[in-house]
Design a protein with these regions (language model features):
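The N-lobe alphaC helix and its flanking beta3-alphaC-beta4 segment of protein kinase-like domains
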Residues: 47-69
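Conserved catalytic-loop aspartate of Hanks-type protein kinases
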Residues: 193
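Conserved C-lobe activation region of Hanks-type protein kinase-like domains
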Residues: 201-268
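C-terminal boundary/linker segments immediately following FHA domains
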Residues: 392-428
Length: 428
């Protein structure tokens, strides 16, 4: 096993060195160290053993390529082979970012569903761009993500696994996350990626595993053969709409029971499609990263913040914003203050403290505020973007709303957010 010492220097391919400062963490494949690189603190992932020529060459290609998006902690430099191993340099994880697995064990919690949806959209966007670039990730699991619990900002790590689609990199994946065809010895590819993605997304929302329920509890010992079955071709989705034999246990899988009940029907049906028997056995039937992203963007438009919440902590997802709404946490009725109707027909629900996102952007441009005027409360919208908004009243008068300014919302008002996007205000 190859481990490094504080103060030790490691040579980089193409020239330069890093100096080991301290260990940050370790896993089954390697150890991550904080290092000094040209006077700046960075991270070095160092493999416990030499992973072979195929893996090394693939890592070299990744270092020389452009990351699909800023969400990827992409390999910056690769080391020379030394001390019977090698590694690569990447940026350090910023403070406030946690591994996805920390959310499963309640070491940290998401602030609200806005942050969960934001994380989900970022995950889907990242892998959509990766796949459009002709790459597959090949080893998608809960250890690949660092997430900010407050806002859902996301970083994707372990990008040494990334390889050209349908190319053998020497990596198969992690048990409980691999597609059935990979469990059976197939080469990971984009279609196996999207199956692993569905597992990750289910775990993000349910904080539980989609293939663990009453059936899997029957096994006292999970041998390799049993695991290959229950997480491979024999996998039964816990909420399968036809086969209820693997339903979550009410106590052991408490999170799954509670959170499934909070899910809107559209999200339930998406998981049933993406993780059902048809998708397990037939890769062409799987939901794509683009389909997932579009669903989460739609759910974000319809996200409701409970008026009883002091901030944004109590929010919930719905499918029909025109129906009678009740907060699942406090049980009180909720009224939508206003809708924004965009040119493409989509509607955006506004309730107090609700953030406004345009299209699939990962940056909010506004937030709904409640203010008092003439002895009554009214809903307003605050501009938090860098653009001045053009506001047209129902009578045709034009006003300009600068950054941080708030305007009361009136029925029939039209807001031009930028050169491409205009919405009409509909007061409920």
């Amino acid at each position: 096993m190859s481990e490094l010492r504080t103060g030790e220097t490691i040579s980089l391919q193409g020239g330069g060195k890093v100096t080991i400062k301290k260990e940050l963490g370790r896993g089954g494949q390697g150890i991550v160290y904080q290092v000094d690189y040209n006077g700046k603190d960075e991270a070095l992932k160092w493999y416990l053993k030499d992973e072979g020529d195929l893996f090394y060459r693939n890592l070299q290609r990744n270092v020389n390529s452009t990351p699909p998006s800023s969400n990827f902690l992409w390999p910056l430099r690769i080391t020379e082979r030394q001390n019977e191993s090698f590694g690569y340099v990447m940026h350090l994880r910023p403070k406030g970012y946690y591994e996805l697995g920390d959310f499963f064990t309640a070491k940290v919690r998401f602030k609200n569903y806005d942050s969960v949806l934001h994380a989900a959209i970022n995950i889907c966007n990242g892998f959509l761009r990766l796949h459009l670039s002709g790459y597959s990730y090949q080893d998608l699991n809960e250890g690949n993500f660092f997430i900010n619990s407050e806002n859902g900002d996301l970083l994707i790590c372990d990008n040494d696994n990334v390889a050209a689609n349908r190319t053998e990199s020497g990596i198969k994946g992690k048990s409980r996350y691999m597609a059935a065809e990979v469990v059976n010895g197939g080469v990971p590819n984009i279609q196996s990626d999207v199956f692993s993605l569905a597992i990750v997304l289910y775990r993000l929302f349910m904080l539980d595993h989609p293939f663990e329920g009453m059936t899997t509890l029957k096994y006292v010992c999970l041998t390799d053969e049993v695991e290959r079955n229950i997480y491979g071709e024999g996998a039964i989705f816990a909420w399968d709409h036809e086969d209820n034999s693997n339903r979550p246990h009410p106590q052991i899988h408490y999170n799954a029971h509670l959170r499934w009940g909070w899910c809107p029907q559209s999200l339930k049906e998406a998981f049933q499609k993406a993780l059902g028997k048809e998708s397990v056995l037939h890769p062409e039937s799987r939901m794509t990263d683009r389909e997932w992203k579009n669903l989460f963007v739609e759910l974000r438009r319809k996200l409701i913040v409970c008026p009883e919440s002091k901030g944004t902590d109590h929010d919930f997802m719905v499918d029909d914003i025109n129906s009678t709404l009740t907060c699942p946490l406090c049980g009180k009725p909720v009224e939508i203050g206003a809708l924004l109707k965009f040119g493409d027909g989509t509607e955006y629900a506004l309730t107090r403290h609700k953030k406004l996102y345009l299209d699939d952007s990962d940056e909010s441009v506004g937030v709904a505020r409640v203010r008092k005027a003439d002895g009554r409360t009214e809903l307003g919208l605050q501009n938090r973007s860098d653009n001045n908004w053009m506001v047209f009243t129902a009578s045709g008068r034009l006003n300009e709303l600068a950054k941080d300014d708030i305007m009361p919302l009136r029925d029939g008002m039209k807001i031009r957010f930028n050169n491409r996007t205009t919405a009409e205000v509909i007061i409920h």
